[in-house]
Amino acid sequence: MLKVRRARADEVDQVLDFYTNMIDGRRGTEFDVCWEHDVHPSSAFLRASVDAGEVYVGLVEDGEGATCIASAMVLNGEGDAGYESVSWHVAAAPDEVLVVHVLGTLPAYHGRGFARAMMEACIDVARAAGKRAVRLDTFTTNVRAQSLYESCGFANCGVCEGFYDRLGRSAVMYEYAV
């Protein structure tokens, strides 16, 4: 059972370790999200996000009574550069939008529905905050994530070519009407 909650400030090192392990564990596999250490996501972004209370973690028991981070994501109102040029379906002011960043699950927990549980938690957070839309993006090559988002009710709002210039990648833009 996955327990989703906000990461605490004293968990910043565990959050950083989670993303390092997730990237390393997926590299070269069919689940590779093509993220780069300290580029996407950067440790500065993750530290600032934990400090701001924007990181949500999905916790599981490790079998010995302790918990570990199996999934994580950042939720804030900050769309990346280029979000303003997308033809979103929901007309919403920036403060009416929740943006999902760097959703990931450790490979050891794939196939258990944890990413879906994280997305459901994200929608709950948006509703509770009175948001009108949840928005996110994913690399065009990340077909598994696209399938997940669409199965969760997110609408495909098109492709932004060269969206991640620093990584040389384009992105598919998604939106959920809250």
Explain the meaning of each model-derived region.
Residues 126-137:
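Conserved GNAT acetyl-CoA-binding A-motif
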Residues 92, 139-146, 150-152, 161-178:
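C-terminal "cap" of GNAT-fold acetyltransferases
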Residues 52-73:
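Conserved beta-hairpin
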Residues 66-67, 74-102, 110, 164-167:
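Conserved acyl-donor/pantetheine-binding loop and adjacent beta-alpha core of acyl/acetyltransferases
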Residues 1-13:
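Conserved N-terminal entry element of GNAT/NAT acetyltransferase domains
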Residues 16, 23-45:
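Conserved GNAT-fold acetyl-CoA-binding loop/helix
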Residues 105, 111-124, 147-151:
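Conserved acetyl-CoA-binding loop-helix of GNAT-fold acetyltransferases
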Residues 43-57, 77-82, 99:
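A short helix-loop-beta-strand connector motif used in the catalytic cores of GNAT acetyltransferases and
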